A protein has these predicted regions:
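A glycine-rich beta-to-alpha transition motif near the start of alpha/beta enzyme domains, typified by
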Residues: 1-142, 173-301
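Surface-exposed beta-loop interaction hotspot
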Residues: 146-186
Length: 301
């Protein structure tokens, strides 16, 4: 039975599976992701397909994802470190993390001295401009900031304490928990909210319950991806943190936010201008959890 190489990452707790794209059609990517994300298989909250040589990431549902983008930054850094330590710069990047041969290969050793700082640029599904990745650290722990050029973004006040932020590739409905308490059944509540605000046909929708408590913002994101037919109460959500920061910046005028995620790890969001262009950075930890091969029934189709 054919196998598919994988790596499993934790960008701020948002468990992410990355696979090599290998020319896999989008419909097959969706099916493979649905199988791999189940608890009986690899488990995870989202999946993406990477072409490292082309520096591209396509999420399984074609949505946009900041945390998966940050995981790719760590993957690229790990691949570069592997190639440097083997003294063979001609080897393709995939041979380190996303190949069958890499399943039993060790991770690169962390050299003495200060952590390396590296920068990459990738294309990501759903987002029109390249995403810059600023990577610090060594395997298996890094900090990665995704730096985005912001297009015109619509922020609508739908009701008291409810705002809809439409980002390219994903929309987020933000509910202030001081007004709208967190429901007992978040999945049912999110489904009703998507229907109420006519979001059922969006590629991806996050429903986020947020609050500020003793000066600390925190959020609980539930993300629905249409094409993979998935609903996950996520441990962290980078695009949701960005949407919340943009909404609060419009209301309160702040430009820097530290937003606690359900994992207990914050994501740091900064809004700034670069050459007159509106930009955003989303920064946080990324760790490599596992790498190897997985047997998926649809690989034989």
């Amino acid at each position: 039975m054919p196998t598919l190489p994988f790596s499993k990452w934790s960008p701020g707790g948002n468990t992410t599976l990355l696979f090599p794209s290998n020319g896999l059609a989008p419909a097959l990517q969706c099916r493979l992701a649905r199988q791999a994300l189940t608890e009986s298989c690899l488990g995870g909250e989202q999946a993406g397909f990477v072409n490292i040589e082309a520096r591209s990431l396509r999420m399984a549902g074609g949505e946009f994802c900041i945390n998966a983008s940050r995981a790719v930054g760590a993957l690229l850094a790990c691949a570069d470190d592997c190639r440097q330590q083997t003294d063979d710069m001609s080897r393709p990047h995939e041979n380190c993390v996303l190949s069958v041969e890499s399943a039993h290969s060790p991770l690169p050793d962390a050299p003495d001295g200060p952590a390396l700082r590296r920068s990459y640029e990738i294309s990501v599904s759903g987002w029109q401009s390249p995403v810059r990745l600023r990577v610090r650290g060594y395997a298996p722990y890094w900090r990665v900031e995704a730096i985005l050029q912001l297009p015109d973004i619509t922020i609508q006040r739908e009701a008291e304490g409810i705002h809809l932020v439409r980002l390219p590739g994903i929309s987020h409905l933000l509910l202030d928990r001081h007004i709208h308490s967190q429901p007992e059944d978040c999945f049912a509540a999110a489904a009703l909210l998507r229907e109420r605000y006519d979001l059922k046909q969006e590629a991806a929708v996050g429903v986020i319950w947020w609050r500020t408590l003793q000066g600390q913002m925190d959020m609980l994101p539930l993300v629905h991806v249409r094409d993979t037919r998935s609903d996950f109460l996520e441990s962290a959500c980078g695009s949701g943190a960005l949407a919340l920061a943009l909404s609060r910046a419009q209301t309160a005028g702040a430009k820097s936010f530290s937003i606690m995620q359900p994992s207990g790890s914050p994501l740091d969001v900064r809004l700034f201008s670069e050459g007159g262009v509106s930009m955003a950075g989303v920064d946080g930890p990324v760790s490599l959890v596992a790498k190897g091969q997985v047997w998926l029934p649809d690989m034989t189709d």
